[in-house]
Amino acid sequence: MADSVLFISWGESIPGREERGLEVFNEAIGLYGRMQQDGRIESFNVVLLAPNGDLGGYFEIQGSAEQLAAVRQDEEFRRVLTDAQLIVKQMRIIDGSTGEGIARDVALYQEAIAKVPQTA
C-alpha cells in the first residue's frame, strides 16, 4: 500500500512553447503509466485545474518511500522533468505522505510538539 507521494505541479506555459509542452505532458503520462504497469509505482493521478493565474495542474505519483526514491533517480523521469522545466513556469516537485505514511508523520509531529512549551 502506498505511504508516500510525489506531487509535481506546474504553472503557466512559457509563451511559444505550448506545443512542446503538450508533447512533454503526454510523455510524462506514458512514463508514469509504464512505471505503474511495471510495479515501480502504485498509481498516479493527473489533475488539470481551471485557469487561475497560478497553478495549472499536477501529477500525484503514489508508492512506497523506496519506490519513489528510485523514481527520483530514474533517468527517463529526470529527463521528462528537465524538459518540463524549460516549458512551464513555477514547476514544483514535493514529497508527501498518504495512507500509513500519514500516521507515521503525525506521530513524528506529536513527538516534536511534546518538546515545545505550549502557550495559550
Residue ranges and their predicted role:
Residues 1-55, 63-73, 93-120:
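Short S/T/G/P-rich N-terminal loop/turn motif that feeds into the first structured element of a domain
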Residues 60-89:
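Mid-chain, well-packed structural core segment of small domains
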